[in-house]
Design a protein with these regions (language model features):
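Conserved structural motif at the start of ABC-family nucleotide-binding domains
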Residues: 4, 19-21
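The feature captures the beta-strand-to-loop junction immediately N-terminal to the Walker
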Residues: 35-37
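Helix-to-loop junction immediately C-terminal to a conserved catalytic motif
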Residues: 50
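Conserved coupling/switch loops of ABC nucleotide-binding domains, chiefly the family-specific signature
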Residues: 56-59, 219
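Conserved ABC transporter NBD signature motif
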Residues: 58-69
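ABC ATPase nucleotide-binding domains
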Residues: 80-82, 86, 90-239
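Non-catalytic connector elements of ABC transporters
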Residues: 258-367
Length: 367
């Protein structure tokens, strides 16, 4: 298991800069997700780590060894990188065992010794057992589900005993019902193997649910790299808060350890850095921090849209001002499936609800 260190990385294609001064630390044995929208440079970063592209400036180190930098560029085969492309990249004419063992004759020094074939077969079967596909060695890729194909691709990447495994949006092609289970499988496989891994994705749910650390890519650099719960609850700025998930960004005034908002006074997250512990701020209230409360004092609002997903429901509401008219900006509320019935069996547009927000809340000094 090796760490990955990226310092001051630049990459442009012609006159189009993609990465600019990017810094990133991937701890040994961790699963780090690179999260960014399409076109943000996620795959370019992965290709630079793999050695498929050369950096224009900066350095990349793996396990303390510089593999890309001024005067240095180790080719992919010398970096001990396992690579899992988006579609898996399995050879259709090879069996599952053939795909998994494809790199072993090159990697394994004893490949030509007596008994090597049997040892190789045993190693392949052990890898298949690791990814939950014991007994699948004689099947062909077309006989597998999408999730099984991705696990074969992962076993092939692990076969070379890599320093780092790189995964390029590995779940994007899977059906929605498979995606969550395969994510959990991959997370457990890496946990057991103790392998350092870097995964790129545009899916916030995927990054937050799978990774030990999430690095948000923006404007060619890393806007913030943190554990998922910190990135979600304590993002670096309001723009990042909106990118990571639904966010209610409201005005507030800080006084000591509380902040006054349209929801009343709420406790302030101690991690929020407010100069002087007072003044105008922008407050982050996630939709799940807001409850619908019957017959209680709270913020009165009218439902403008209601979306039911089974496990939860999302309401878009317009707060009322003190005179009963439309007040401040719209608010997003997320409640567990069924709990919205506290306000009635249905919540069509125009329904009046009472809202209560729960702290602590995070905030930034207002611009």
């Amino acid at each position: 298991m090796r760490d990955v260190t990226v310092t001051g990385l630049d990459k442009a294609f012609g006159a189009h800069p993609v990465l600019a001064g990017l810094d990133l630390e991937v701890p040994a044995g961790s699963l780090t997700a690179i999260l960014g929208p399409s076109g943000s440079g996620k795959t370019t970063l992965l290709r630079l780590l793999a050695g498929f592209e050369r950096a224009d400036a900066g350095t990349i180190g793996i396990g303390g060894v510089v593999v890309d930098g001024p005067g240095v560029h180790l080719p992919p085969e010398r970096r001990r990188i396992g690579y899992v492309p988006q579609e898996g990249g399995l050879f259709p004419h090879l069996t599952v065992a053939g795909n998994v063992g494809f790199g072993l004759p090159v990697r394994w020094p004893g490949a030509r010794r007596p008994g090597a074939r049997q040892r190789r077969a045993g190693q392949v079967e052990a890898l298949l057992e690791t990814v939950g596909l014991a007994g699948f060695g004689r099947r062909y890729p077309h006989q597998l589900s999408g999730g099984q194909q991705q696990r074969v691709a992962l076993a092939r990447a692990l076969a070379i005993e890599p320093a780092v495994v790189l995964l390029d949006e590995p779940f994007a092609s899977l059906d929605a019902h498979l995606r969550a289970s395969v994510r959990a499988d991959v997370q457990e496989i890496f946990r057991r193997a103790g392998t350092t891994a870097v995964l790129v994705t545009h899916d916030q749910d995927e990054a937050l649910s799978v990774a030990d650390r999430v690095a948000a890519l923006r404007d060619g650099g890393i806007a913030q790299c943190a554990p998922p719960e910190d990135l979600y609850s304590r993002p670096a700025d309001p723009g990042l808060a909106s990118f990571i998930g639904d966010a209610n960004l409201v005005d507030g005034v800080v006084s000591g350890s509380t902040v006054k908002t349209l929801f009343g006074c709420l406790p302030l997250d101690p991690a929020a850095t407010i100069p002087g512990s007072a003044g105008q701020v922008t407050v982050l209230i996630r939709p799940e921090q807001i409850d619908i409360v019957p017959n209680e004092n709270g913020l009165t609002a009218q439902v403008t849209s209601f979306r039911y997903y089974g496990h939860d429901a999302v309401l878009y509401v317009q707060p009322e001002d003190e005179a009963g008219g439309a007040g401040s900006q719209p608010v997003v509320v997320r409640v567990a499936g069924g709990t919205h019935r506290a306000a009635g069996p249905h919540l069509p547009a125009g329904t009046t609800v009472t809202l209560l927000a729960r702290g602590p809340v995070f905030a930034w000094p207002a611009d």
